[in-house]
């Protein structure tokens, strides 16, 4: 069935972009969805307007949040012993000598089709989930009984099935790890019959510019395997639309369409050089697709092998300014045209103990950092400084060469993944909530913002979501999303999307802390102080008595999410406050809107 949809046309990168929506009839880009949906791209993805996950290229998403996928299936004729290869990326001999006769090469049979059933959380009604829907995507065999695909292909999965090329039987698959930042997911299939005669793919090295590349998958337009060819156009640190992170990416001009997401990209030797995952769409550009390179794939697989789970890509947690201006360098006593200026350090980052505002970072693990925040890459290229931190693992130590007040020195810091005050993905899949006398409290998250639409939140809350930093471990912005009308909350029933600041004079740290304060309160009244000095006072005993009626009226199973029943542990003995509320959020570099400022 043909897919007719309006494309997001603008390519501008805006900090507060305008909204857009479209309707598609049969397929999404990257996953093939089985129902008609109204789409609205997530706010953090609309910030770099043209960049889309494959499932969002034609505007189809799962009601409020995109779902992923590409196409693929596989059936193979090679030795089953190949299944037991390790997960490590192998850069040795090519799997085939000639790539010209692609249809005859057995490695095509390592590409499988993924069928996923999704049930996404309902962030507006956090005690329930959205309607179930299905999509299809791609994956491929990498050895040791494992499959690799995109994380957005299996987001919010309840059931995952895979089918090999030339076979009509589907097998149940299990999601072992899901890397939201790098948009990768690891699957396993326990049924030995699925692996009979399987031939896993071999990974190749990072390609060079103008190298030929072939993308394999099952895009819309047919049911059999599809092959498209092109060349490598660019290799650089790229914004990942699903993960909202900046990692190494390969730009190609081969057609990547709905159905290719999660499928492999091959070089001329038949080695897999990456995973297709997103495209760039605008009125002024065409044939711009992106592939996750094997360096990122290797990091993801090694992370899982080392820790038994995905722990993420670490960073320094600093806001850097380029030092191109000679007068600026002279004022900082930087003798050469190198180094980047530290303008801000995240309070929760380990680097906050060794770096401070005004330091100039001139080297990272002995590698010189240029004044444009770039470092040497391969023989004659340069790449963004962020590339060096992304090669590390959580808990690794980095040695920094810095200039402080004109003096050169060496410092060491531990690298950890960034923790957003307003997270882009909800861990565990289900949002937390607390209901007090009909007031529904929940942490502010990007999925909630997408679902509610920016217009209903107010500029102040949106500014906090985008520009505020967490000042201590575990901090959240807690809001009242709505009020379930009852006589106990008369006068407050029209509240919605307002941040709660204090309860009975105590500053609220997170949703769990709020639940703890409510549970331990002995006062006659519950006094909530909201932003803009709005006050809500409830009789504590009346509020408790009204709970059962409110739950029954709205068919809600509990006054709180399951995690809030656990004993509360204070996230920090001492809360380090910052004097600046805005302008220091760990948003992506493209969202900063200022070319000379970037996070690393």
Can you name each region flagged by the protein language model?
Residues 114, 125-128, 190-200, 226-286, ...:
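Active-site region of chymotrypsin-like
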Residues 1-41:
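N-terminal chloroplast transit peptides
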Residues 110-111, 115, 146-151, 206-219, ...:
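Active-site-proximal beta-strands of protease catalytic cores
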């Amino acid at each position: 069935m043909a897919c007719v949809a309006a494309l997001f046309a603008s390519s501008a990168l805006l900090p507060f972009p305008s909204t857009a929506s479209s309707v598609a009839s049969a397929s999404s880009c990257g996953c093939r969805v089985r129902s008609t949906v109204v789409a609205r791209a997530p706010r953090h993805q609309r910030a770099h307007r043209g960049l889309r996950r494959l499932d969002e290229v034609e505007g189809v998403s799962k009601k409020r949040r995109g779902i992923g996928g590409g196409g693929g299936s596989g059936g193979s004729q090679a030795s089953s012993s190949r299944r037991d290869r390790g997960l490590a990326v192998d850069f040795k001999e090519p799997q085939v000598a000639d790539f010209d006769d692609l249809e005859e090469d057995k490695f095509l049979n390592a590409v499988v089709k993924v069928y996923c059933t999704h049930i996404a959380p309902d962030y507006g009604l956090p005690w329930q989930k959205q309607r179930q829907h299905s999509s299809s995507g791609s994956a491929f065999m990498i050895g040791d009984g494992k499959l690799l695909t995109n994380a957005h292909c299996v987001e919010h999965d309840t059931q995952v099935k895979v089918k090999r090329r030339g076979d009509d039987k589907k097998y149940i698959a299990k999601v072992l790890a899901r890397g939201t930042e790098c948009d990768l997911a690891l699957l396993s299939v326990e049924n030995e019959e699925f692996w009979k005669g399987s031939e896993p793919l071999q990974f190749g090295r990072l390609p060079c510019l103008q190298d030929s590349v072939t993308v394999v998958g099952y895009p819309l337009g047919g049911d059999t395997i599809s092959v498209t060819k092109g060349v490598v156009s660019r290799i650089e640190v790229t914004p990942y639309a699903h993960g909202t992170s900046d990692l190494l990416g390969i730009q190609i001009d081969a057609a990547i369409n709905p159905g290719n997401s999660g499928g492999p990209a091959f070089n001329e030797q038949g080695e897999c050089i990456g995973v297709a995952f997103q495209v760039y769409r605008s009125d002024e550009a065409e044939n711009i697709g992106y592939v996750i390179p094997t360096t990122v794939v290797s990091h993801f697989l090694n992370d899982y092998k080392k820790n038994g789970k995905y722990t993420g890509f670490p960073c320094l947690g600093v806001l850097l300014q380029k030092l191109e201006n000679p007068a600026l360098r002279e004022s900082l006593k930087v003798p050469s045209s190198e180094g980047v200026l530290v303008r801000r350090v995240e309070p929760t980052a380990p680097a906050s103990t060794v770096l401070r505002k005004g330091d100039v970072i001139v080297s990272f693990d002995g590698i010189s950092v240029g004044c444009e925040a770039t470092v040497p890459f391969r023989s004659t290229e340069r790449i963004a400084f962020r590339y060096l931190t992304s090669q590390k693992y959580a808990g690794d130590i980095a040695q920094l060469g810095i200039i402080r007040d004109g003096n050169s020195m060496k410092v060491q810091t531990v690298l950890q993944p960034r923790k957003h005050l307003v997270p882009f993905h909800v861990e565990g899949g289900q949002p937390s909530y607390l209901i007090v006398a009909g007031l529904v409290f929940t942490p502010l998250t990007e999925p909630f913002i997408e679902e509610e639409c920016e217009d209903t939140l107010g500029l102040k809350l949106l500014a906090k979501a985008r520009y505020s930093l967490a000042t201590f471990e575990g901090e959240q912005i807690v809001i009242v999303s709505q009020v379930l009308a009852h006589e106990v909350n008369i006068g407050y029933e029209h509240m919605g999307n307002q941040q709660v600041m204090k309860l009975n004079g105590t500053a609220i740290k997170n949703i769990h802390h709020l639940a703890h304060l409510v549970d331990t309160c002995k006062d006659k009244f519950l006094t909530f102080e909201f932003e803009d000095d709005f006050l809500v006072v409830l009789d504590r005993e009346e509020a408790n008595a009204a709970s059962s009626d409110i739950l029954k009226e709205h068919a809600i199973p509990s006054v709180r999410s399951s995690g809030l029943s656990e004993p509360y542990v204070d996230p920090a003995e001492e809360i380090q406050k910052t004097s600046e509320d805005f302008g220091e959020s760990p948003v992506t570099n493209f969202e900063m809107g200022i070319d000379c400022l970037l996070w690393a």
